[in-house]
Regions:
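Mid-chain, well-packed structural core segment of small domains
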Residues: 64-96
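N-terminal, charge-rich interaction modules
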Residues: 1-36
Length: 139
């Protein structure tokens, strides 16, 4: 896993004990390397609200389909990470930090952090704006 300053990946991503999370299209064995905290539930198949979702996408089309689906499942304080291939990875993609951010902002979320998810994937973290969290809670 890529890292900086020795910070564990799970801490960089903000996954905490008791979280209900989704890892969407994650690379094989990705979850095994996260060293998840206790009581974290990886949840893809049910419709339970998510504290954390990480979408691995290679195309703008994938992102425009997946972003609203997982935004709708977030808790008011939840976070949605979008991960796309780094330019240096050699993976073919039409995504960049700019268009990932544009799609997220258009969906009503705000980006608050960027990091290397691993040697291939970059990640951008989105959350609901503070003033929107009460509205999300009531939906």
């Amino acid at each position: 896993m890529a890292g900086y300053s020795g910070t564990p990946q799970v801490k960089k991503l903000g996954i905490k004990s008791g979280f209900n999370i989704a890892l969407v299209n994650a690379p094989r064995n990705f979850a095994l390397h996260l060293d998840l905290p206790t009581n974290v539930t990886i949840n893809l198949k049910t419709r339970k609200p998510l504290d954390f979702a990480l979408l691995f996408v290679k195309s703008e089309k994938e992102l425009t389909v997946g972003f609203p689906q997982y935004t709708a499942r977030l808790t008011p304080g939840g976070m949605l990470w979008v991960s796309w291939p780094k330019k240096s990875s050699g993976v073919i993609t039409d995504l960049s930090e700019t268009n990932v951010r544009t799609i997220g902002l258009a969906a009503g979320l705000v980006d608050v952090k960027i990091c290397a998810v691993d040697d291939i994937w970059s990640g951008l973290k989105f959350v609901f704006r503070l003033q929107d969290r009460a509205r999300v809670r009531s939906v």
